[in-house]
Amino acid sequence: MKRLMIAVLCLTLVLFGCSRKQTAATTAAPEVPFGNYIQPAESFAGGSGTQEDPFQIETVRQLALLAEVINRNYDVEHYDDEQLYRYGYYVLTADIVLNDPADFDTWQEAAPQYAWEPIGCKGEDGLLYEFRGVFDGRGHTVSGLYLPGDVHTEGGGLFGRVSKATVCNVSIADSLLIAADEEEAGLLAAQCSNSVIQNCQVSGRVSLRNTYYGGGVIGYAGGKNAKLKDCSFSGSLTAQAVSGQVGGVCGYLACPAEGLENHGALELKDSPFCDLGGIAGAVSRCALTRSSNSGSVTARTEAGSVGGICGQLSAGLTWQQDGNVDTVAATEISGCVNSGRITADSSEQVGGIAGSGFNCFRDCGQVTLRDCGNTGTVTGLSKVGGIVGELYLEYSAYQIENCENAGSVEGQSRVGGVAGSVGVNKGPSAMDGCENRGSVTAAEDAGGILGWGVDMNLDWQKETDSGALSILRCRNSGAVTVDSGTAGGILGRLMHPGGAFAVDISRCENTGTVHSTGSGRLGGILGGCTAGYVIGRDEGAACYIRYCVNGGTLSYGDAAVNAAAPAPAAGGDDQTLNATEKALSTMSGSAAGGIVGASFQTVVESCLNRGQILLSTGTTPIRNYAEHSAVSGESATVFVGNIYGLFLYSPTDPENAFEREHITDCAYTGGFDAPAYAPFLQEESPVISGNRRISEEEARTLAEEMLR
C-alpha cells in the first residue's frame, strides 16, 4: 500500500503542491545553469516514523523521498499517511552525496548533474507544506547540494520551511545556494518557525539577490518556542540589492540562540537599507549568547547597520494572535566575540559586535550588551564603535557591561572605542566596567569609550522619565586621534539638555594619548559638552565627573613640545592674551584640559590629572602663560588648564552657579599654575576651589584610592 501511495504521489506535480518552476527571476540577474532532479526512492531504508522507530535514510534517493512526501499534496484518502510523514521522525544512517564536489568552484558557471528540491515549501495553491517532524543527522554530512534559484525553493537549502520541528546533528558541505527575488534564504533552511535547530554545521557558498532575509544557515528564525544552538557557517556569502537583513548564520533572528559561529566571508553591495552581521543581520526581542565571528564582514557600498555579531538590535513587544501585548521583550547579546575585520566605509552605524540598537514602542524592553569582546578592525563612515556603532533608544534604557575592545576603530565622526554614538530618552542607562585598548581615529568627535552622546528629551516624555546616562569604572588605554573637533580619553562630545537628564562619569581612567592634528577641544576624560541653557534649558549640571584619573598625554600638531615651559621675558616674540576677548571670540576654538577640554554646565569633583599637555602650531612652539592659562602661536589660540581647558562659566545666574558648574577638590601634577582657564569668572570664586598640585608619588597613591 505504501509503495503504491508513493508511486501515485510522484505523479502529482500536477494541480497542487510545490511545482518546479522554470521561470526567469523578475530582477536582472546572471543566468543560472539548471541541473536535473534526483529520482526519489520508493521507500526509506527502514523504520516506521515514530520516535522509537524513526524512518532511516542512507541514500540520496531516500533523502529525496523525504522532500517528495512533504512537498506534495495528499487527497483525503491518504490524510493519515500525510500526517505521519509531515510529523514523523527521521535519522540519517550514512553520509549523503548529491553531487561530486570535485568541481564545486565552477558550479555557478556549469551546473552539476543534480539540483536539489528543499524539504518543505509553500505550494502554488497558497498552502504551506512545512516539515514539522524531527530530523536527526546523527553526525552525518549531506554534501553537494545545488540550488540554482529558479526553482520553487523560495530560497531553501536542505530544507525550505520548517515549523514546530527539530533539526539537529547534521552537517552540510560543499553546497551552493543561489536565491533571487525570495523572502528568505539559507543553506540549511529558508524559514524556521517555532523550531529547534541544534548542532548543525554548514559550509558552502550563498549568493543572494533581491532577497529580504538571508543567512548562511537560516534565512529567518523565530517563534515563542524556537531556539538555535551550536550552529556554524563557513565559506562565503554575497548579497546584492537586498533590503532586509543578512547574516553569516541567520538573516533575521527572533528567538533565543547560543553557540553560533561564523567563519565565512560576508560581502554586501547595492543595499543601502540592508543590515549585515557576522552572526545575524538583526537580533530582535531575544537573547544571543556565547557566539563568535571570525569572518570578514564587508559592505562595499552604503548599507544599513553593520556589525561583527549582528547588524541591528531591536527591543519591543511580543504580540498575541489577538493583537494584545503578551510580553515586554528585551534584547541581549552576551558572551559574544568578534575577531573578523568589519569594513563599511560608506555606512553609518558600524560596530565590532553590533551596528545599531533601537526600539519603536513605549515601555518596551531594554537593550543589553554584556561580556562581549572585539579584536577585529572596525571601519565605517560615522557612528562607529569597537562594540556598538549607535544606540538610539527613544523608549527604553540600555546597558553596556564589561565589554572590551582591542581592535582599531576608524571613521569620520562619532567614533568610540566601545560605542560610537548613543542617544537615550528613558533611563537610567549605563556603560559599566568597559575597556578599550584599540586606537580610535576620526575627523571629529572621538572618545576612548564613547565618541558622541546625547539625551534627546523629546516633548512627549513623561515627567517621571529619566534619560540619565552613567559611565562607570571604564578604562581607556588606546590612542584617540582627530583631525579637528572634539576628543576625550573617555567621552568625546556630549550634547545634553541637563537637569534630570545628566550624565555621570565616575571612577574612569584614561592612559591613552588624545591628539588633534589640527585644532579642537581635547580632554583627558571629556572633550567637550554643549548643554542646557544653550538649547533652552537651565536645570542644573549636564555632566558630573567624579573620581576620574587621566594619565594620558594631550597634544596638538605633529611637532608637539611641552607647553609647560615658563613664560618668556618681557619683550619676547610671544604675546599674552586678552582673556575675556579671546574667550568670547573663540568659544568654538581649541582648548585642552587634563580632565575636560571645554564645556558648559559641567561639575568636576575629586579628579586627578597626571598627564602632560603638548602643543605646537606648525614649526612654532606654543608656550603657556600662567596668568591666563592660555597660549598663542602663529595662527592658533589654545586655552589650557591642568584640570579644565576652557571653563565656560555662565554669568547669567551667579547665585545658582555652583550647582550647575564647578571644579573642586581636584589634584594635578602638570606644569600649569592654574587648574582651568575661566575668562568670565571673578577671582576667588567658590566654583573653582580646593584644587592643588601634588607630587607624582602622591598621585600614584591617590589614583589607586579613586579607582577602587
Please describe what each predicted stretch is.
Residues K2-L9:
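Sec-dependent signal peptide recognition
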Residues L15-G17:
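C-terminal motif of bacterial Sec signal peptides marking the signal peptidase cleavage site
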Residues A7, A24-A25:
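General helical structural elements
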Residues Q22, A28-R708:
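Surface-exposed repetitive/solenoidal architectures
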